[in-house]
Structures are given as structure tokens and as C-alpha cells.
Amino acid sequence: GVIADLAAARQPVIDERGRPETPPAPEGGLAVQLAGIVWTLINRQLLSRDTGGLDVTIVNDIPDGAGLGDEAARGVAFALALLGDGDDLDDAPVRARIAEVCHQAAEMFSPVPPLRARYTAALRGQYDSVSVIDYADGSVTQAPHPQSGDLEFYAITVEQARVDRSAEILRRRRFVEEACRAFGTESLRLLPDASQRVIEWLTAVHKVHGEENTPEIGDAAAWLAFEERETERGLRMARALRARRIDDIWHLIAQSQSGLTGPYGLLGSEAMVQLCIVRGALGARAASAGNVEAVIAGVETRRAPNFTQDLADDGLAVIRLGRGRVAGLADAGR
């Protein structure tokens, strides 16, 4: 069928030099994305092949372009609805598998590069906690949520906030994926001296195959350095949250934002971040770098009314963030 053909077009092929060719970017609207979830669930043997046609209605109160993961929330909700008859939907291994399926479907059928952590947090998170996800081993632990009576968080966005830097995001991700394949590892974090060895590998690739469809050495080194430092910042952030040292998180957020728009080169949110700081935020960072210009900002509760009013006067949309809840099925009988 159509979905199977689209999935086949996304599979990597090997060129005459023995290197994987980059498949075309996914194309298709919401119907294709939802059908892709059905197709992936069937092929992963989570859904019967006898599944018939579907009439889908989606109710969504997440503002478009806010960078709050509405695509992931929609995909997870749809998958849970399809699997609603299962008795084990609350089991961690099952939820981990559903998150993997939803992320895989988004990679194949969504034009927006998905963030795997959003699917994991939606299905395996906990109320009142921040999910700490280790990509090296897939483990998920929880840290105390920083929101309190003295601290609020907001998403700040603007009309037409979506930006299309999908090609740049995919270019960085595919470089890391090719490096992982070259070294036979699922994560560069499992590779000793990863940055140095990957650069040596890339240099050899350039000498043998040329530089076509590969990053320049300087760009690759900057990306790897950012990934390494961002991982360290994530670990330090988790320790600060668990120790309830909230004052320690703001410089980590600032460093992360600086790295995104500097060495990593995903521009688009820096002006909004600076405006939030000027208006009184303790810290702010891109909500979904390269996809939207929205940011997430933390503000002292006593300053929140002036902060939100000033940004509203600037023509921005300001959305107060709660702590959320884990994805689940509502009782249709209520």
C-alpha cells in the first residue's frame, strides 16, 4: 500500500562505494503520520494485521508552535487508543516498546525530526517529576520537579514560530548514526575516546571517498564537542535537581543555549531568549531548537505577573506550564 511504499523509500541503501545513501526526507500530512503509526505497530506485532479503517478525531489544547511536543503527545495518545484492550499497558517494558515504535514511526513519516526523549517522557514519566533519560542504556529515572511556590515556568512563542531547519538537524543526526555504525556501537557514549576516534574516522573517509555528503572536520568536531558537553550538563542538571539546588540550574541552561546557537549552529531562538532575560527570567532555552522559535523560561513567582504582561505587550504568546501527567487512557464511560 501507500504507507508501505513510503516506508520502503525511507530505508537506507548502500552506494557503489559501500556507504549508506541518505534517504529522502519524509513528506506527508497528519493522515500519513497516523497511518504510519498503525503500519509500524502492525509490523512490530503490537497490532493485528486485521485492523480495519479508522475514523480519527483529535482534540488538542497544545498551541501550535510552542515547542511543547504536541506531535509526540498526539502520536502516543493515538498508539495507546489503538492498544487500549491490552492489560499490560502500564508495564514499563510495554511502554518502552510503544515509545520506541512511536519514535520510529515519526522518523519514517513525519517531516519534523522527532526527539526520542519526548515519547519516552510521555509514556514513562511521573507526575511531579522530571524524567532523566540516559540514551546510552535507555534507562529512565526521575528527579524532583523544580517548579515550586517560588518558581514558575512558561513557554513563550509567537505567531508563525515554526522554522524549517529539518535538513540541518538531520545532517547532524545522520553523521552521528554513521559514526555509530562505523564503530559498531549503539551510542557514542559507549565508545572510549569517542570524539577523537570519530574525527580520525571521518578524516579517513574524506581521504578515501572524498567529502561529498559528509561534514567538514571543523563542523564535525564542534558538533561532537557540543554533544559531549551537553551530556555532562545533563548529568549536572540531574544532580542539581535531586539535591534541590535550583540556583545551580540556570547557568547550565545558559550554557546549553549558548552551545546550541554557537558550536552546534542551530540558530533561531537567541533573540527570544535574550528578551526573556531582559524581562526578568532567571533562565531560558530553546523549546525545540531548529523546529520552532519558542523558548521555555523560568521566572520567580513574585515577578511572574510583570513578566507575562510585558511579553504579552511585546506581542508574544505566554503559556504557563504545569507539571503534566503521564500518558494514559481516559474512561470513555465518564
At which residue positions do the language-model features occur?
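C-terminal nucleotide
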Residues: 1-28, 132-286, 296-334
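Catalytic DNA-binding helix-loop module of base-excision-repair DNA glycosylases/AP lyases
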Residues: 293
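Short glycine/threonine-rich catalytic loop with a Thr-x-Gly-x-Asp
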Residues: 68, 286-287
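Gly/Ser-rich oxyanion-binding loop with an adjacent helix/lid
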Residues: 6, 23-148, 157-159, 280, ...
